[in-house]
Amino acid sequence: MNIYIQQIHSLCLQNKYTNWYVKIIENAINRQEIIGYSETHHILPKCFRLGGDHDLENLVDLTAKEHFICHMLLVKMVGDNQMKSKLAYANWQMTMRSNGRDRYKICAQQYEFLRKQLSKF
């Protein structure tokens, strides 16, 4: 098993969101390749400050949808409020404009969730 997935298991809450996150990451690691557009994701987020920022084993290529979902899941995987705020902010930034157009379109429910998370901090 990937060492960064092991760290996720030991650092994060043991809940369905962590299980879903790990499953997405494991599927991406085992996938041959993504046809078309992909985004590189840190399995163990940089904001955890536990290293691995430049380790290729901590990087995985995800589809845009998988990447956005993983960032939504990360917010629900941690109990520490400071870490939760960093992850919520990173997720919020993914919805911001990039090159003059929306990077991701989110539904009202996702918008409400992110705004509530950010308002707590």
Which functions belong to the PLM regions below?
Residues 11, 27, 73, 94, ...:
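Residues that form generic nucleotide/phosphate-binding pockets
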Residues 79-99:
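N-terminal accessory alpha/beta regions
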